[in-house]
């Protein structure tokens, strides 16, 4: 499965548009508590613990996106957009969402 942020794939023709697909992942409040406890990981203004959690959430969202595209018979997702949003009372959760257009490539 090809997943790309571009609207098309060079050298490949889109033969069918299957529809919009999306995947989401939410990091809960406990993750933030753990992250703040791990602030000692900070090197050069970056937290390795926080970055690992964001990467894991992004991978989950993209995996869900891929699974939904496969269910529609697609072999690629184009125009993928990743969004990050703070949710919940006291901003205790972070949502990572991925959306794009499932397509069939020639």
From Swiss-Prot:
UniProt xrefs under Pfam families: YbjQ_1 (PF01906)
Taxonomy, superkingdom: Bacteria
Gene3D superfamilies: Hypothetical protein apc22750. Chain B (3.30.110.70)
Family (UniProt): Belongs to the UPF0145 family.
Family annotation (NCBIfam families): PRK02877.1
Name recorded for this polypeptide: UPF0145 protein Daci_3728
Gene source species: Delftia acidovorans (strain DSM 14801 / SPH-1)
């Amino acid at each position: 499965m090809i997943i790309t942020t571009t609207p098309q794939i060079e050298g490949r023709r889109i033969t069918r548009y299957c529809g919009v697909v999306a995947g989401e992942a939410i990091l809960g409040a406990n993750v933030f508590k753990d992250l703040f406890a791990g602030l000692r990981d900070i090197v050069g203004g970056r937290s390795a613990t926080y970055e690992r959690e964001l990467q894991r959430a992004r991978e989950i969202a993209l995996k869900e996106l891929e699974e939904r595209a496969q269910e529609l018979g697609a072999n690629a997702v184009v125009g993928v957009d990743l969004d990050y949003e703070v949710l919940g009372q006291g901003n205790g959760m972070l949502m990572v969402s991925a959306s794009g257009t499932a397509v069939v490539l020639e």
